Amino acid sequence: MDVNNVELIISAVRPEQYPETDLPEYALAGRSNVGKSSFINTMIRRKSMARISQKPGKTQTLNFYKIEEALFFVDVPGYGFAKVSKTEREKWGVMIETYITSREQLRGVIQIVDLRHKPTEDDRMMYEFLKYYDIPVIVVATKADKIPRSKWQKNAKIVRETLDFDPDDKFVLFSSETKMGKDEAWQFIKEGME
């Protein structure tokens, strides 16, 4: 998709704050500091539309980005961030679960994992949750440029096995540096919009 117009419409915490729209939505889920903001910026060809932070846990709301009057990316808080209180993490969990299970406009979830590391229990639980609710999902393994190409397949196998990955789902190696995987991710989105 050729992206020229992107706008952050609202940062929401409750359903009544979600934008009233019929446009399809794609949620981006992943651990804190896994590269969600870099993924968004790469997909929409912007350097800093989604703020990138060295501090995990920066996103604390559901951020609705309208793209080309055609769809929304919804950046959800990173899960598994230890430096916020348990109460705060539980609030984020409820906010994410409410959005994912009740939003009619949601067409799919882009689950982002770090190719360099074995997925955590939180990653596994998120994937299992999406499968349980029969929500279309693509797993995007970011930061491929940070490890030697010779390790890509080995690391991808570890990610798939740890998640108990469904071979019917799409799995993409991604790099915000080289733009590898960008076209495959857009293909998943386009298919869900048809």
UniProtKB/Swiss-Prot annotation:
Enumerate the PROSITE patterns for this protein. G_ENGB
**What sequence ranges are listed for the domain EngB-type G?**
22-194
Could you tell me the Gene Ontology terms of the biological process aspect for this record?
division septum assembly
Positions binding GTP in this chain are: 30-37, 57-61, 75-78, 142-145, 174-176
Keywords, alphabetical: Cell cycle, Cell division, GTP-binding, Magnesium, Metal-binding, Nucleotide-binding, Septation
Q: What does the record give as cofactor?
A: Mg(2+)
Any GO MF annotation of the entry: GTP binding
CDD domains assigned to the protein according to its UniProt record, in alphabetical order:
YihA_EngB (cd01876)
Q: Which domain of life is it from?
A: Bacteria
- Give the matching Pfam families: MMR_HSR1
Signal peptide location in the record? Answer: none
Heme in keyword set: no
Q: Which GO terms describe its cellular component?
A: cytosol
User: Where are the annotated coiled coils located?
Assistant: none
Residues recorded as binding Mg(2+), renumbered to this chain, are S37, T59
NCBIfam families recorded for this chain?
GTPase_YsxC (TIGR03598)
Q: What does this protein do?
A: Necessary for normal cell division and for the maintenance of normal septation.
Identify its protein family.
Belongs to the TRAFAC class TrmE-Era-EngA-EngB-Septin-like GTPase superfamily. EngB GTPase family.
Name it. Answer: Probable GTP-binding protein EngB
Q: What species is given as this protein's source?
A: Listeria monocytogenes serotype 4a (strain HCC23)
